[in-house]
Amino acid sequence: QLQEFAIQKRNISSFIRKIQQYAQYNKKIYTLDFKISEKMAYFLDNVKGKKEIIDKLKISDNLSYMTNNSNKNADFLRNTTNEGNFEKGFSIYLLDKKGEKIYYRISTNTINAAKYPIISIYRAKTPIKLNEDYLKASLWEEEI
């Protein structure tokens, strides 16, 4: 399972970065459609009012995922700005397959003054149970 976490955190963070770079380079708004329900992430372009898939990423069935959105297990959309940032930050948590313990967090921070998001990967110092306060900074360490 450790290898699965390594692969997924790399794949998801690279996918987010790819969308950000396209937006920055093309000066255009794109959409990340993260479908936890389908274990898929989509990179969408808005062409004449229709969403067209530029790329997609299958996320592993061997892990569980949640977000920092109000409905933690719901699918979500994030648009980029045409400068390459996201309209709003988000975090994706990587959990064991049963969805009982959190191991990693991929955070996309848009609050900084820069035009681009900061994409960071944090590792739980020890796996965090869902009923713990997993937002406490002391439970996490940033990976380089």
PLM regions: where:
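N-terminal helix-rich module
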Residues: 3, 7, 21, 25, ...
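Phosphate-interacting basic helix/loop segments used at nucleotide- and nucleic-acid interfaces
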Residues: 13-21
